[in-house]
Structures are given as C-alpha cells and as structure tokens.
Swiss-Prot record:
N-terminal signal peptide: 1-16
Residue numbers with lipid attached (S-diacylglycerol cysteine): C17
UniProt family annotation: Belongs to the OspA lipoprotein family.
Keywords: Cell outer membrane, Lipoprotein, Membrane, Palmitate, Plasmid, Signal
Biological source species: Borreliella burgdorferi
Annotated protein name in UniProt: Outer surface protein A
UniProt GO cellular component terms: cell outer membrane; cell surface
C-alpha cells in the first residue's frame, strides 16, 4: 500500500513539474519587467530538471521556456494560430530583449525587434525570402533612423525623423546619406554604421564672389558656412539630434546673438541661403 501511495505521489509530482510553465501565476511565480515594456513570469521553484520555468505574452502570443537563472533571463518560444513561430530571447543581465517572428518552418524571419534598457530599439521587417526589407532604429530621445525599400545589396531609402522635421536620403551598406537642397546649395549629412556623423556642403554656383563653402569640425559637430572666404553662418548638430543656427557679423569674425534651434525644414533651407 505504501509503495502504491509513493508511486501515485511520484506521478503527481512529475505531472506538476510538467505543468509548471502553463500553471504559472502570481502565487508560484515572480513578475519581472523587461525592456520593450514586456514582462516575464519566473517560477519560484525549479522543475524536475533543475530549471526555472518562464512564461510571457507578447503580441497576444503565449511564450514558454526554461532557464538556469531565476532572474527572468532565457529563451521562450511559442506558436501563433497561423502556425508561424515566435521566439523571445532575454539577455542574462536583462539589458536587452529580442523578439522574433518566423514562418512556419521556424527558420525564415518575418520580423525582429530588439529593445534595450536604455530605451533604444531596432525594428526589422523581412521579405518572403527572409531578407531585410525595412528597418527602424529608435534612439533614446525618441528620434528615429528609418530604412525602407531595402534591396539584397544593402541599398535603399533612408529617413531621419528628428523632433520637429525629417531629413531624407539613401542608405548603402549601413551608411546613410541625407540631403537638403536650397538653390545651388546641397547640405549632406552622412551617418556611419558606428553612428559617427559627418556634414558637408556643396555649391554648384560658378560665381566665386557668391559661392558658398562649408568646413566641418567633427570635434564640435559644427559646420561653418562661408561666402568668398568670409564666415557667414554656423550650424551645430547637437548630441540631442537637434540643429542650431547662429550668424556671424558682417566682417565674418565673430558670432552674433545666440544659437537658435531649427524647428522646420524651411528654417534649415533658409540657413543655406
């Protein structure tokens, strides 16, 4: 009789372990906040394999997994109604989450979102072949860098969405070139894969007396515009992803007044006149 009861108890214990993930609730688990406004439930006790159970719901998809740690890190997986697969990877230090959607084969990517603790994120969309077709990188301050109409060679359209206006251009191999044109003047802003910014000015005007030139100082992120070797305007591309403008005096030697933030694309074009 004792052996029978022990056997029943063992079976019930094994069933409880197997059901650990699906039965997670407020009583037997702890809720952990994650980057990307996500939450994961972590079991308070280990299962029969010595693992902690994980459970999360993302975009109405129930995800389950296990982990050696009890802090919420690990890999969770689930299946949508259309049989496509979902995967959530939580970094060991909880600093980053990666949420991926795959086709039914579980290999061909449909979309991917990487969210970091510093409020930055990267959203990627993929075509039928699993190739990158669009990408949006959101910075900590809310400004964005967007790639669209991406081709297999890494080229496509680019757009930088600033606080008050947008700059447009192209991307090639993760190097972005944005342009603003006003008359014969073209302002070019290049953003390298590392995030380093370089700004240049080109003027097709053939009259030397009115031809504009630009000198870029990478240390201060400043573009100084001159006409016939005389400084006229200073544009500063700040770390907050804003642009300020300040004029020089008639002699071109000293800056006048204070720097003013450019809030519209027309204001930026006016600074190039």
């Amino acid at each position: 009789m004792k052996k029978y009861l022990l056997g029943i108890g063992l079976i019930l214990a094994l069933i409880a372990c197997k059901q650990n993930v699906s039965s997670l609730d407020e009583k037997n688990s702890a809720s952990v906040d994650l980057p990307g406004e996500m939450k994961v439930l972590v079991s308070k006790e280990k299962d029969k394999d010595g693992k902690y159970s994980l459970k999360a719901t993302v975009d109405k998809i129930e995800l389950k997994g296990t982990s050696d740690k009890d802090n919420g890190s690990g890999v969770l997986e689930g299946t949508k109604d259309d049989k496509s697969k979902a995967k959530l990877t939580i970094a060991d230090d909880l600093s980053k989450t990666t949420f991926e959607l795959f086709k039914e084969d579980g290999k061909t990517l449909v979309s991917r979102k990487v969210s970091s603790k510093d409020k930055t994120s990267t959203d990627e969309m993929f075509n039928e072949k699993g190739e990158l077709s669009a990408k949006t990188m959101t910075r900590e301050n809310g400004t964005k860098l967007e790639y669209t109409e991406m081709k297999s060679d890494g080229t496509g359209k680019a757009k930088e969405v600033l606080k008050n206006f947008t700059l447009e251009g192209k991307v090639a191999n993760d190097k972005v070139t944005l342009e603003v044109k006003e008359g014969t003047v073209t302002l070019s802003k290049e953003i390298a894969k590392s995030g380093e910014v370089t700004v240049a000015l080109n003027d097709t005007n053939t009259t030397q007396a009115t031809k504009k030139t630009g000198a870029w100082d990478s240390k201060t992120s400043t573009l100084t515009i001159s006409v016939n070797s005389k400084k006229t305007t200073q544009l500063v591309f700040t770390k907050q992803d804003t642009i300020t403008v300040q004029k020089y005096d008639s002699a071109g030697t000293n800056l006048e007044g204070t720097a003013v933030e450019i809030k519209t694309l027309d204001e930026l074009k006016n600074a190039l006149k």
